[in-house]
Amino acid sequence: MNNNLQRDAIAAAIDVLNEERVIAYPTEAVFGVGCDPDSETAVMRLLELKQRPVDKGLILIAANYEQLKPYIDDTMLTDVQRETIFSRWPGPVTFVFPAPATTPRWLTGRFDSLAVRVTDHPLVVALCQAYGKPLVSTSANLSGLPPCRTVDEVRAQFGAAFPVVPGETGGRLNPSEIRDALTGELFRQG
């Protein structure tokens, strides 16, 4: 996608996000749907769209670690744990961090932790940088259907008018690996 088209697509996506609505965008493996993590209205719309219970918790995807810091508590990390995490970021590995009490329950669900990732997908990096914060990110698929890997698949599942940032996925076959930031325990194989 040329720079002007990408810039226009990102600007249009930010307009939708500012309206507390949900967008779709390519990630490392599949298309994701996401919204403003600070908007309970937007997150509830996303959960309703996905038919996902709020108690499961969500993932935030960001352009850089600084964008994630308001949502996580990294004070318990040792230098070795921090080095391990930073050696995997940016990239397709999601880490579950302790969450401070200020992190909204619509993000953490029933947990006192939050799953977060610093992406290396150039379009998502540009989107998060332009928006100035991370996005809620979950796979773009309706309950019971496979995750979307193309714009056409997103539109087939969510409708022709659904706001999609066009682009290619990163080509990975599987969604991101998920690990505990403190213990390194593998929750989901990537």
UniProtKB/Swiss-Prot annotation:
The organism's place on the tree of life at top rank: Bacteria
Alphabetical GO biological process terms: regulation of translational fidelity; rRNA processing; tRNA threonylcarbamoyladenosine modification
Group of enzyme by EC: transferase
Molecular-function GO terms, alphabetical: ATP binding; double-stranded RNA binding; L-threonylcarbamoyladenylate synthase; nucleotidyltransferase activity; tRNA binding
Effect of deleting the gene: The knockdown of this gene results in a loss of t(6)A37 modification in tRNAs.
Consequence the record notes for mutating K50A: Loss of activity
Database matches in Pfam families: Sua5_yciO_yrdC
Major location (coarse): cytoplasm
Catalytic reaction equation(s): L-threonine + hydrogencarbonate + ATP = L-threonylcarbamoyladenylate + diphosphate + H2O
GO cellular component: cytoplasm; cytosol
EC assignment: 2.7.7.87
Signal peptide positions (record): none
Keywords for the protein's UniProt record, in alphabetical order: ATP-binding, Cytoplasm, Nucleotide-binding, Nucleotidyltransferase, Ribosome biogenesis, RNA-binding, rRNA processing, Transferase, tRNA processing, tRNA-binding
Subunit structure: Interacts with TsaB and TsaD.
NCBIfam families, A to Z: PRK10634.1
Family, per entry: Belongs to the SUA5 family. TsaC subfamily.
The protein's name: Threonylcarbamoyl-AMP synthase
Species name: Escherichia coli (strain K12)
